[in-house]
């Protein structure tokens, strides 16, 4: 980027007040010319900064912070007076609401949101903005300006192949999980296939194909094809038909917890803590404020709010948890499906399903649903209640009628979750079914004979900073014939020490179908010891199926794109040792993992995996190391630069020889950042704006363009005609009188955008002279700057 801000650095450090929020012009400052000269600044450019620290006219890529939260680099324009232009593109990337008045130019944000302060920081290439929290776009609220449309095809793949060799033979197995599809104008067609090959025998399992579209105005997602009965309270089945349900990405997200207060000074800092941990910090303007959707750690601990004023004073207050934790959420929105049950069942009747949910009050909710098919009907209703701040209770009753077999029954369920004092939590669940109650999938299964009579489940957890965390959970099921009764008990303890983490797990199972014989306890002890940059050593012992094993392993990373794992284990009873190792690598355009193992003297295993995605779009074919989701984008470097690393929410991706890269996953209708890793750029290339904020609707195929600037820079050693070095702080112009830069030290000039033939004019209060420079026609790509010498004559 053109470093036009270099002149402002010295003045900016000493003089950088914020832009006046009330529109009152700060009085002009008269700089002492001798003082400027002593600071190494040409007095002739002082008029640029006579009123406040500001940027020279033009466009800059600045680090923008809104209420203390960095929004990344945003292209920012300043007019001939150094005033900022808050246009629509800037406000969108900064996450600020756009004033209601229609306008294509610059918005008067101070008029729209009084109290706004804007502080340019030329010496840091940054811009600080303080606004009322009401001016910030909440997550999930603003659906405007989301990109829609676009066309691209995709193929996601996950391939695996393994071979096992034994003393008496061998076995081969391969599988391919494939997802193919195409996005056209927000419509999505997807087909899933799961192919396997076992010792030469091929099969195709679990295939499905469907068409999908989200209707934004209705906040509804529609799927047609092989879909599921997505009923919120009843079990469904796979059908050939149509499913309509709320699009979760269009539902308002956030905690729903808000904090209000009053700040006495502009740019006051509000700190919110829960359980002694800082969970949110934001700058607010003077006056009353409301902070929505505070990211609370839990709904049961009070919030401690501290307002730190600009003058250093502070005041704090408590927001009791009882004001915000007495609420429950239901599965809101209507869900509807109609179609024919697929061919995986004994019967394939036509079926209709409908369900919905309602929040009755902040502390009560209800869900209900029905399923109607040929010879089958079912209905259910579920209620949820928060009678106490730390107690949640829900109950459900379902009824079904199988007219073909003349069966009618009910099913009852009760759940409770109680957060007790001293970090103790309790969960319990009870389910009981009549002998003749049937879910849809059970009613159309001719072989279904033994329903479960009842299930009891209990969970208890407790944590302590000294003793660690404990978790106990178990369940017991009873069947009507008594042959399929079973029970399960799990106990877990874990504790993090200074140099290691220890965990102990025990599982006990008992099955009545095996005459109440012990199915074999599972016992596992693991010690993890981190070392180095990102490596972990483990020591463990496990007891299962009446056998004891001891082992040790090491896992870690070789580089940002490569990891490894090695393991050795000893079977105490069989007196055999097994060795295993694997290495995984992100090859920028796919991911590969290789593993091998040996057990005893006659057993060997080998396997390899490969996964990633392929996008076919109007710019060509682009490979991704990650799975490509419903909503994605194609990033493009305009100079076809390969190997540039781009960070996104889904992980890093790299440009190919065309300069393209797939941004594989974008959260629909949410603003997300895509950023160039400038360290991966060639040394002679700059990015005008290395961070782009994007927002797309579901199914959209977006385009993200990055303008690469091929920079020729030069470090010049300049002497005057008398042989002395050019003084520090002298302004340098081109032959047409345009300012270029300032000498940064005696005889030293750093110049951007050099040309093969250049003429530089140097003027100060004592003399003026001219320099003629000549550089090679072709710029070297492997150096940050070229060097040259010149004499000013």
Swiss-Prot record:
GO CC annotation: cell outer membrane
Main location: membrane
Protein location: Cell outer membrane
Xref: PROSITE patterns: FIMBRIAL_USHER (PS01151)
InterPro entries in the record: Fimb_usher, Fimbrial_membr_usher_CS, FimD_plug_dom, PapC-like_C, PapC-like_C_sf, PapC_N, PapC_N_sf
UniProt keyword annotations, A-Z: Cell outer membrane, Disulfide bond, Fimbrium biogenesis, Membrane, Signal, Transmembrane, Transmembrane beta strand, Transport
Keyword Electron transport in record: no
Membrane topology, as annotated: Multi-pass membrane protein
Disulfide bridge positions per record: 769-792
GO biological process: pilus assembly
A GO molecular-function annotation: fimbrial usher porin activity
Signal peptide residues on this chain, from the entry's feature table: 1-21
PANTHER family xref list: FIMBRIAL USHER PROTEIN, OUTER MEMBRANE USHER PROTEIN
Family: Belongs to the fimbrial export usher family.
NCBIfam families tied to this protein: PRK15304.1
General function of this protein: Involved in the export and assembly of a fimbrial subunit across the outer membrane.
Name of the molecule in the record: Uncharacterized outer membrane usher protein YhcD
Organism per entry: Escherichia coli (strain K12)
Protein's gene: yhcD
């Amino acid at each position: 980027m053109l470093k036009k801000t270099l002149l402002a650095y010295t003045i900016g450090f000493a003089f950088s007040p914020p832009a006046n929020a009330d529109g009152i012009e700060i009085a002009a400052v008269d700089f002492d010319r001798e003082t400027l000269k002593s600071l190494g600044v040409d007095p002739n450019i002082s008029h640029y900064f006579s009123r406040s620290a500001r940027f020279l006219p033009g466009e800059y890529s600045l680090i923008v912070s809104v209420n203390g939260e960095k929004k990344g680099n945003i292209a920012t324009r300043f007019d001939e007076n150094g005033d900022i232009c808050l246009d629509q593109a800037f406000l969108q990337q900064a996450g600020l609401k756009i004033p209601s008045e229609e306008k294509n130019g610059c918005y008067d944000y101070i008029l729209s949101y009084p109290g706004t302060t804007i502080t340019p920081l030329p010496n840091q290439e940054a811009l600080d903005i303080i606004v009322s929290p009401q001016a910030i776009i909440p997550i999930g609220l603003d659906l405007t300006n989301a990109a829609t449309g676009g066309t691209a095809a995709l193929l996601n793949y996950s391939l695996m192949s393994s071979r096992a060799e034994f003393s008496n033979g061998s076995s081969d197995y391969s599988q391919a999980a494939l997802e193919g599809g195409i996005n056209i104008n927000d419509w999505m067609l997807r087909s899933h296939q799961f192919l396997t090959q076992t010792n030469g025998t091929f099969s195709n399992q679990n295939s499905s194909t469907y068409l999908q579209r989200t209707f934004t105005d209705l906040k509804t997602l529609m799927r047609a094809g092989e879909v599921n009965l997505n009923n919120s309270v009843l079990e469904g089945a796979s059908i050939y038909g149509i499913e309509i349900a709320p699009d979760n990405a269009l539902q308002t997200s956030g905690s729903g917890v808000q904090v209000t207060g009053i700040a006495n000074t502009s740019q006051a800092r509000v700190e919110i803590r829960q359980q002694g941990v800082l969970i949110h910090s934001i700058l607010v303007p003077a006056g009353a404020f409301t902070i929505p959707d505070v990211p609370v750690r839990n709904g049961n601990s009070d919030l401690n709010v501290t307002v730190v004023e600009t003058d250093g004073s502070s005041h704090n207050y408590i927001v009791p948890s009882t004001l915000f934790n007495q609420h429950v959420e239901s599965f809101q929105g209507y869900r509807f499906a109609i179609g024919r049950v697929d061919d995986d069942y004994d019967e394939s009747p036509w079926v209709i399903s409908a369900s919905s949910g309602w929040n009755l009050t902040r502390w009560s909710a209800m869900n209900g649903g029905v399923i109607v098919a040929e010879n089958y009907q079912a209905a259910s209703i579920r209620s949820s209640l928060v009678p106490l701040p730390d107690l949640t209770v829900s109950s459900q009753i379902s009824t079904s009628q199988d007219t073909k077999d003349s069966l009618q029954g009910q099913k009852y369920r009760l759940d409770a979750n109680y957060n007790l004092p001293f970090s103790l939590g309790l969960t319990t669940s009870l389910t009981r079914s009549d002998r003749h109650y049937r879910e849809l999938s059970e009613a159309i299964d001719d072989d279904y004979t033994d329903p479960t009579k009842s299930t009891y489940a209990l969970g208890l957890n407790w944590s302590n900073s000294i003793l660690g965390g404990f978790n106990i959970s178990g369940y017991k099921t009873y069947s009507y014939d008594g042959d399929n009764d079973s029970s399960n008990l799990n106990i877990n303890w874990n504790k993090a020490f200074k140099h290691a983490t220890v965990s102990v797990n025990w599982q006990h199972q008992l099955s009545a179908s095996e005459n109440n014989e012990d199915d074999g306890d599972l016992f596992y002890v693991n010690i993890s010891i981190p070392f180095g940059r990102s490596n972990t050593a483990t020591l463990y012992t496990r007891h299962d199926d009446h056998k004891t094993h001891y082992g040790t392993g090491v896992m870690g990373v070789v580089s940002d794109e490569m990891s490894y794992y090695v393991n050795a284990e000893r079977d105490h009873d069989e007196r055999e040792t097994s060795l295993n190792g694997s290495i995984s690598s992100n090859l920028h355009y796919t991911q590969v993992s290789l593993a091998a193992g040996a057990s005893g003297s006659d057993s060997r295993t080998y396997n390899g995996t490969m996964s990633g995605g392929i996008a076919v779009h109007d710019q060509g074919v682009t490979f991704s190391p990650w799975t490509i989701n419903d909503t994605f984008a194609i990033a493009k470097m305009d100079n076809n630069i390969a190997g540039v690393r781009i960070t996104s929410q889904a992980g890093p991706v790299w440009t190919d020889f065309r300069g393209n890269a797939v941004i594989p996953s974008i959260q629909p209708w949410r603003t997300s950042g895509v950023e160039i890793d400038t360290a991966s750029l060639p040394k002679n290339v700059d990015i005008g704006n290395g961070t782009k904020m994007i927002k797309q609707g579901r199914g959209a195929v977006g385009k993200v363009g990055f303008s690469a600037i091929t920079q020729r820079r030069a470090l010049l050693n300049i002497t005057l005609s008398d042989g002395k070095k050019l003084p520090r702080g002298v302004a340098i112009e081109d032959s047409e009188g345009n300012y270029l830069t300032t000498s940064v030290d005696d005889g030293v000039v750093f110049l951007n955008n050099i040309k093969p033939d250049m003429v530089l004019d140097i003027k100060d209060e004592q003399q003026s002279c001219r320099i003629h420079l000549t550089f090679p026609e072709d710029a070297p790509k492997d150096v940050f700057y070229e060097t040259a010498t010149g004499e000013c004559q």
